[in-house]
Amino acid sequence: MCKRLVASALTAAAVLILSSGILAQTSAPQGTTNAAAPDLTGVWRRSRKPPDNARRYTMHEISGTLTNQEPPMTPWGQGKYEAAKPNVGPRGVPISESNDPVTKCFPPGVPRIYIMRVGQPFEIMQIPGRVIMFFEYDHMVRQIFTDGRQHSEDITPSFMGDSIGKWEGDTLVVDTVGFNDKTWLDGEGLPHSDALHLVERIRRVSHEAMTIDFTIDDPKAYTKPWVAHNLFELKPGWNIVEVVCVDDNANFLGTEKMLESGK
């Protein structure tokens, strides 16, 4: 189980080295990179209190669910869902009995990494041809290529998948395929297969707020595509700190109190 260890903020030198490495590896062409693209940069965390004038956002505060309605599952998907033993939510079991992959230090994957139950933040950086996301949870890094490339014809399945993006006005549209089937979509065990096709529409609706609409299309697990809506808030002055994964750490739940009293 992952335990959040509060450490000193990442040093400026480390960030500079990482950024330089990324810039050096950026490949041409960059013809679709818009120099005037909307600015998504900053440290973000899922919002705990959507604004009064916002439509209903469907991520549960405690259990880290992606949606508050059960999506239309296929028999295969229903079987996977019923076999899941989450340690949160109405179907929750003790951690020692859970088969949630993250309790064994597996990466949560996308989209679940956005909504991990302790509310850990992520940072967005934009460089020519790419949008980079640094997640505090287990220090995962996600690259979204915006240089006009298409998905590779030979993708090695992974936890984060293969992501390409384009700008539609003020919205970054991210298309991701190439997932493995070793993760859940959320903390309550919503399943997916290696056929998952995820589309995210990321939009900064104000200086302090950003929305992400997730379209889940997985014909093996669900009878039709479905959408979940999530709201994120800017955290000025926050830094991404060190997080390590410790297998079967029963003290994991205590990190919520740390976040409430500290960050």
Regions found by a protein language model. Give the residues of each.
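Classical secretory targeting signals
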Residues: 4, 15-16
